[in-house]
Amino acid sequence: MPRFFCPAPLRTGDLLDLPAGAARHVQVLRLQPGDSITLFNHGPGWEGVSPCGEFEARVTLMGRSQVQVEIGAHQAVEREAQRAVHLAVGMPANERMDWLVEKAAELGVASIQPLMTERSVLRLAAERATKKVDHWQSVAISACEQCGGNRVPVKIGRAHV
């Protein structure tokens, strides 16, 4: 069953419009009204808003750029490690950082902190660093969707010296 990250509170019985990226993915998979998907949204800041785990959902409406789902039963699934692992890593070359974020998210790392060290190959200006953090966030979300993790390491910090 396809899994999608949904950055909104999830409650059983609610109707929800999927975010643009997830909606496009549902359309590419050629899902139809009545098909089932799995939603998750848990990351730091969601404690008390939505319970951790997964929600079954059923596609109810397919539009040109809109997909609406009805949220079903909650399943309290915890696939992450018992202890929080925080990863601090010196900035490698560009593609390697993408790979590192992907694998760290698959392993269940709680947070990733890039470090600008004396020998770092990659140097980022403030504006470019913000764009990179957003990109790494989307890489982490994709990795969690694929591997079955329910906690996205959204605490990807800005690079520190």
Language model: regions and residue ranges:
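RNA substrate-binding interface of SAM-dependent RNA methyltransferases
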Residues: 72, 76-158
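N-terminal positively charged helical leader segments and presequences
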Residues: 1-76, 127
